[in-house]
A protein has these predicted regions:
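Pyridoxal 5′-phosphate
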Residues: 1-128
Length: 128
């Protein structure tokens, strides 16, 4: 998959000279993503992996097909490598907890002095 995302793909930048540097907290979405989300909410909004009715099945299919699309986009070996979380903090916590049995006494966890607090505490906890 070849992709070239440009600033012009993001509607938020259309009307003002915005410089946005807080993507770790909330990332801006390109128009294609906004349009796809809007369409999903309008036509397939239901619980994913829980509903046995048609609308729920469609919602689950869209959810899982997005995993495939993302897997292709990031060149993952498998869509099973793509995990959805509520945000970066949850992702970091999930990663650090998943490494708990792999980390051994004497191993080093390296962080820069510029890390956000949410990327320090999970590693401090793991180091204990």
């Amino acid at each position: 998959m070849t992709s070239l995302i440009q600033k012009t793909d993001f509607p938020i930048f259309d009307d003002e000279k915005l410089i946005y540097l807080d993507s770790a907290s909330t990332s801006q979405k390109p128009k294609i993503v906004l349009d796809t989300i809007k369409k999903a909410y309008e036509s397939s909004n239901a619980n994913v992996h829980r509903a046995l009715y048609d609308l729920g099945s469609r919602s689950t299919e869209l959810y899982e097909s997005s995993r495939e699309t993302i897997s292709d986009f990031i060149n993952a070996h498998s869509s099973k490598e793509v995990i959805f979380t509520g945000g970066a903090t949850e992702s970091i916590n999930l990663l650090s907890y998943s490494l708990e049995k792999k980390i051994q006494r004497g191993d080093e966890i390296l962080l820069s002095h510029m890390e956000h607090h949410a990327n320090i505490v999970p590693w401090q906890q793991l180091a204990k």
